[in-house]
């Protein structure tokens, strides 16, 4: 995709256009300074507002100016962290001008690609407010999709730890929890933006637009609830992993203690027979096959002790 594309819907069909015009959707993906200046001058927008969404630390907000409205929200994104796929959030800028809508983002995003690929039905770039709300709605559903993906990853970790717990599982679980923290923070900030949109009198809205905005609010709240639920579940999974590790350690210690007890019997008896003591004090010392008899007694005692320990489940690893 080009760094700056222009689209417009005609008869519900999205097509790429060559010139700016009424009903145009201008898509800016990681624009250069010169491209940002060109758009800022063309539509009389402050350059800082055009570049705002390119700052990862930019907070979500609504800014209404005389000839344009700037909306910045956080959208989910995938990045490589510690050689693993991780989820984070990045800003998406939406600028409403007189007859166009401009979207600005630091990278390509499935939130916008869904519209370009025709996955979203019945949207029109000419209906700016409704189109913006459809973008926000798609953003909420994308959050929910990634949340379900993270929950499936957590389920796989739970299945693995039933057999063997590895350091990688602990790291993966921590990564998932960090991702949920990012999502929760961004969704709450987006919720504030949506609440402001419902109250702004300077932004003209039609009744059907307000209904769609209500749907966006519902989906955003649902995403927040899903995030909290999954955080609680991951917290429980982490406690489960800690319990499993402790139980396995306790079982290993009990097994080693049981082996030590079993091995102590032949050690003590052989130690006694190894002392420099007269043979008359040593049972079976002068008896034919005395060594074999003593070994048999040691074996029987060891077996009896092992059976007792097994019944007490001390020989279970």
Task: Report each predicted region and the residues it spans.
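Hydrophobic alpha-helical transmembrane segments and their immediately adjacent juxtamembrane loops
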Residues: 221-317
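Long amphipathic alpha-helical coiled-coil segments
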Residues: 197-210, 236-246
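Peripheral, non-transmembrane regulatory/ligand-interaction domains of membrane transport proteins
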Residues: 4-199, 205-206, 212-215, 219-226, ...
């Amino acid at each position: 995709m080009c760094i700056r594309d222009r689209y417009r819907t005609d008869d519900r069909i999205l097509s790429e256009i060559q010139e700016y015009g009424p009903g145009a959707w201008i898509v800016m993906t990681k624009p250069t300074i010169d491209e940002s200046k060109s758009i800022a001058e063309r539509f009389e927008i402050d350059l800082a507002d055009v570049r705002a969404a390119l700052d990862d630390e930019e907070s979500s907000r609504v800014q209404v100016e005389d000839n344009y409205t700037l909306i910045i929200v956080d959208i989910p994104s995938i990045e490589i962290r510690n050689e693993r796929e991780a989820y984070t959030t990045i800003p998406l800028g939406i600028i409403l001008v007189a007859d166009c809508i401009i979207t600005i983002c630091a990278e390509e995003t499935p939130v916008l690609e869904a519209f370009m690929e025709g996955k979203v039905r019945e949207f029109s770039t000419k209906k700016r407010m409704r189109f913006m709300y459809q973008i926000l709605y798609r953003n909420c559903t994308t959050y929910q999709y990634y949340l379900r993906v993270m929950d499936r990853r957590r389920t796989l970790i739970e299945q693995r730890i039933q057999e063997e717990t590895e350091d990688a599982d602990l790291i993966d679980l921590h990564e998932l929890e960090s991702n949920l923290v990012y999502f929760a923070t961004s969704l709450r900030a987006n919720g504030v933006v949506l609440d402001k949109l419902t109250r702004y009198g300077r932004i003209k809205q039609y009744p059907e637009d307000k209904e769609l905005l209500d749907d966006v609010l519902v989906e955003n709240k649902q995403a927040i609830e899903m995030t909290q639920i999954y955080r609680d579940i991951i917290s429980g999974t982490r406690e489960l992993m800690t319990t499993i590790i402790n139980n396995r350690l306790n079982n290993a210690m009990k097994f080693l203690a049981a082996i030590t007890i079993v091995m102590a019997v032949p050690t003590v008896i052989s130690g006694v027979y190894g002392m420099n003591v007269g043979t008359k004090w040593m049972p079976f010392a002068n008896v034919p096959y005395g060594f074999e008899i003593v070994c048999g007694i040691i074996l029987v005692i060891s077996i009896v002790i092992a059976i007792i320990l097994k019944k007490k489940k001390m020989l279970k690893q």
